[in-house]
From Swiss-Prot:
Catalytic activity: CDP-ethanolamine + a 1,2-diacyl-sn-glycerol = a 1,2-diacyl-sn-glycero-3-phosphoethanolamine + CMP + H(+); CDP-choline + a 1,2-diacyl-sn-glycerol = a 1,2-diacyl-sn-glycero-3-phosphocholine + CMP + H(+); CDP-N-methylethanolamine + a 1,2-diacyl-sn-glycerol = a 1,2-diacyl-sn-glycero-3-phospho-N-methylethanolamine + CMP + H(+); CDP-N,N-dimethylethanolamine + a 1,2-diacyl-sn-glycerol = a 1,2-diacyl-sn-glycero-3-phospho-N,N-dimethylethanolamine + CMP + H(+)
Function of the molecule: Catalyzes the final step in the CDP-ethanolamine route leading to phosphatidylethanolamine (PE). Can also catalyze the formation of phosphatidylcholine (PC) from CDP-choline, but does not substantially contribute to PC biosynthesis. Preferentially uses CDP-dimethylethanolamine and CDP-propanolamine as aminoalcohol substrates. Shows highest activity toward di-unsaturated diacylglycerol species as lipid substrates. The CDP-ethanolamine pathway may play a role in maintaining the proper PE species distribution.
GO biological process, one term: phosphatidylcholine biosynthetic process
Up-regulation conditions: Repressed by inositol. Repression is dependent on the presence of CPT1.
Record's protein name: Choline/ethanolaminephosphotransferase 1
Control of this protein's activity: Requires a divalent cation activator, and is inhibited by CMP. Activated by phospholipids, especially phosphatidylcholine.
One Pfam family recorded for the sequence: CDP-OH_P_transf
GO cellular component: endoplasmic reticulum; Golgi apparatus; Golgi membrane
InterPro entries with a match to the protein in the record: CDP-OH_P_trans, CDP-OH_PTrfase_TM_dom, CDP_ALCOHOL_P_TRANSF_CS, CHOPT
Residues spanning the membrane: 50-69, 173-193, 212-232, 265-282, 286-308, 322-342, 347-367
One Gene Ontology MF term: ethanolaminephosphotransferase activity
Segments in the Cytoplasmic topological domain: 70-172, 233-264, 309-321, 368-391
Domain of life where this protein originates: Eukaryota
Source organism per UniProt: Saccharomyces cerevisiae (strain ATCC 204508 / S288c) (Baker's yeast)
């Protein structure tokens, strides 16, 4: 077997059972009925993973459009681009919702589909940030890093929660449902009125000592995002604690040990982001396309490993080598700058792209290995349906 799935755990794929709890009224009364009808445009011979990839293609097209018209993420673009982004994001959500419906419709649900779906979502968590950054005109700034942190943290928390509870929870207000719809509406409004009106309208002033702070609409959005992130974290912890408390096989002291052990699974992620914060504080010019993508692929790899460990019933993956990249970049930056006297901008350029190459390479290796192992053991194809499965 492969590096990421030992022989003793691959057989656990046979006991796979998807469980979810969706409390969203929007999803229940509007989106799910819409997806049930929309999925009939896909022929029964089409593999569900093709639908997932097709939806992701809309985001890729959006991002390519962003960097064609706004490579620095801080200028106005033609109004039609915002409408195209809204359409692309909505179609991504639609295809993402339909892949599971289609899989159940043709009896092709399985662990490979869940891995594929969540892995694409993890990459999209970073790519969609570029759309938001261009929409608001924030550029390659600390705000961009904070936006990515919020997206990846929410995704990591959700995956961590599912690992422990074996259930995917979507609350009354969640990012994959209401969050995406709000993004679509904001893109349409930006296309109509322009980013200055929607995102940078002055609202009020806050005085802190001798400092006067002007608050605009984007500041309010960031405040709401922070509030949502905190609520999501509390909800995830509450669901994990509840799961272990309700475990009939656990005594009180064992339950506390399990809860404490679960919390430790959050430490690697926040330690990783602490190293990122130190790096960009030390040298803000690291905030570049290559660096953002490096962080995104590292996050996707880490989440992917948690999903695989959940599906194959392995221990929680506490160590992930790509998470050491920012620390290595800090050390190499200091060495190159202090000992060898290399220009700062050259060091940043080289280290940013080196980090991107390493994170991308590891993620490709991981996905290739996992897809191979899953398809071999389950006797399925990744992007098509075996003829024996169609009969």
């Amino acid at each position: 077997m492969g590096y990421f799935v030992p022989d003793s755990h691959i057989e656990n794929l046979k006991s796979y059972k998807y469980q979810s709890e969706d409390r969203s009224l929007v999803s229940k009364y509007f989106l799910k009925p819409f997806w049930q009808r929309f999925c009939h445009i896909f022929p029964t011979w089409m593999a569900p993973n093709i639908i997932t990839l097709s939806g992701f293609a809309f985001i890729v097209i959006n991002v390519l459009t962003v960097f064609y018209y706004d490579p620095n993420l801080n200028t106005d673009t033609p109004r039609w681009t915002y409408f195209s982004y809204a359409l692309g994001v909505f179609l991504y959500q639609t295809f993402d919702g339909c892949d599971g419906v289609h899989a159940r419709r043709i009896n092709q649900s399985g662990p490979l589909g869940e891995l594929f779906d969540h892995s694409i979502d993890a990459i999209n968590s970073t790519l969609s940030i570029f759309i938001f950054a261009s929409e608001t005109g924030m550029g390659f700034s600390y705000n961009l890093m904070l936006s990515q942190f919020a997206m990846l943290t929410n995704f990591y928390l959700s995956t961590w929660e599912e690992y422990h509870t074996h259930t995917l929870y979507l609350s009354e207000f969640s990012g994959p449902v209401e969050g995406i719809l709000i993004v679509c509406v904001s893109l349409i409004l930006t296309g109509i009125y322009g980013k200055q009106v929607i995102w940078h309208t002055y609202l009020f002033t806050i005085t802190v000592g001798d400092k006067v702070i002007d608050v605009d609409t984007l500041d309010i959005v960031f405040s709401l995002a922070v509030f949502g992130l905190v609520m999501n974290a509390l909800s995830a912890k509450r669901n994990v604690d509840k799961y272990y408390r309700n475990s009939t096989s656990s005594a009180n002291n064992i339950t506390q040990i399990e809860q404490d052990s679960a919390i430790k699974g959050l430490l690697p992620f926040f330690a990783y982001y602490a190293s990122i914060a130190l790096l960009v504080w030390m040298q803000p010019s690291f905030i570049t396309l290559s660096f953002i993508l490096s962080v995104g692929f590292t996050g996707a790899f880490t989440v992917g490993r948690i999903i695989v460990c959940h599906l194959t019933k392995q221990s929680f993956p506490m160590f992930n080598a790509p998470m050491l990249i920012p620390l290595c970049q800090i050390v190499l930056y200091k060495i190159c700058l202090s000992l060898w006297g290399i220009e700062s901008n050259k060091i940043v350029f080289a280290l940013s792209w080196l980090g991107f190459g390493l994170s991308l390479g590891v993620h490709i290796m991981f996905m290739n290995d996992i897809i191979h192992e899953f398809t071999e053991y389950l006797d399925v194809y990744a992007l098509s349906i075996k003829r024996s499965k169609l009969t």
